[in-house]
Design a protein with these regions (language model features):
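Alpha-helix-loop-beta-strand connector modules within alpha/beta enzyme cores
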Residues: 139-163, 196-203, 252-266
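Conserved, mostly hydrophobic/aromatic
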Residues: 53, 100, 125, 174, ...
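Catalytic beta/alpha-barrel core
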Residues: 6, 142, 158-167, 179-190, ...
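Glycine-rich, proline-tolerant flexible connector loops at the mouths of alpha/beta enzymes
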Residues: 126-144
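Active-site mouth loops of central-metabolism enzymes
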Residues: 8, 95-112, 135-140, 160-164, ...
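Non-catalytic terminal accessory/regulatory regions of metabolic enzymes
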Residues: 1-97
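Catalytic alpha/beta core domains of metabolic enzymes, predominantly
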Residues: 85, 200-285
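Short, well-ordered coil/turn segments that N-cap beta-strands
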Residues: 93-95, 121-123, 155-161, 177-179, ...
Length: 285
């Protein structure tokens, strides 16, 4: 349920209504937009009498939200969320590039790539220290040693680092050392992991699963936000289709669709979608 306050409503009147709503065992999210304040009500609203809220002299209108996602819903938060990482801003019309190797393989490799990334104008450095692989015999990443190398590259370049978490038990380490925590496509519906990263203070980059719908994707973001972390960045990285020319098919339509459905920022990963270097630039453009 969404409650839109009348323009110019005093803060004390907003606080009074919020207090009454919380007495109904509802979680009340407050969004101060341009010209008005919006209250997003999360919880069991089925027994809430909309008319009793509507008659409040400071309420403009009351709307029920049919979608299962609430905190991530554009109706709850009409303005774009902007996530700040170092000097970079993601969302709200800001342009930022995240670049780096798929996996960290050596100090020389990651530091050289980091310097190139910085020189090219990218704002964040990504690199995999822990790698989810289809085959158990494939390289699984350097683990904590790779994370140490990412931290060294950050020290040399000043670029914030983005890397993937796979195990909820690593949350404390990532909270301490990583600037943006990535949840990969294979873990998009690992709900225990989502709950754990939701307790973190660091921004979360949530990749879309191989065959997940927009609603399922946003619901995964909702898991994170329900735990208190609202700094979620959605990442479209390609979906599985019948086409075999590319590794995956980049779903360009996800960008305008998500922007209409949610206030969360969305970025695309053309590298993992295409799997071919020469397609990265045209897909990104």
């Amino acid at each position: 349920m969404v409650v839109v306050m009348k323009p110019g409503t005093r803060q004390q009147d907003i606080d009074a209504l919020v207090s009454r709503l919380k007495e109904l065992d509802l979680d009340v999210g407050i969004t101060n937009g341009v010209g008005c304040t919006i209250l997003g009500l999360v919880g069991d609203t089925t027994a809430v009498d909309m008319d009793k809220i509507s008659i409040n002299p400071h309420v403009e209108r009351v709307m029920r939200v049919q979608e299962p996602y609430k905190k991530a819903n554009r109706k709850f938060h009409p303005e774009d969320t902007v996530v700040s990482v170092g000097n970079a801003k993601i969302g709200g019309g800001n342009f930022s590039v995240i670049a780096g190797p798929c996996s960290v393989e050596s100090e020389a490799q990651i530091c050289a790539v980091a310097e190139d990334v910085k020189a090219s104008g990218a704002a964040l450095l990504r690199g995999g220290a822990f790698k989810p692989r289809t085959s158990p015999y494939s390289f699984q990443g350097m683990g904590t040693a790779g994370l140490d190398l990412l931290m060294e590259a950050r020290k040399q370049t000043g670029l914030p680092i983005v890397t993937e978490i796979m195990d909820p038990r690593m949350a404390e380490l990532f909270e301490r050392e990583v600037d943006v925590v990535q949840v990969g496509a294979r873990n998009m519906q690992n709900f225990e992991l989502l709950k754990e990263v939701g307790k973190m203070s660091k921004p979360i980059l949530l990749k879309r699963g191989l065959s997940n719908t927009y609603e399922e994707w946003i619901m995964s973001a909702e898991y994170i936000m329900a735990e208190g972390n609202e700094n979620v960045i959605l990442c479209e990285r390609g979906v599985r289709t019948f086409e075999s020319f590319t590794r995956n098919t980049l779903d360009i339509s996800a960008v305008p669709a998500i922007r209409q459905m949610s206030h969360l920022p969305i970025v695309i990963d053309p590298s993992h979608a295409a799997g071919m270097y020469w397609m990265v630039e045209p897909l990104a453009l």
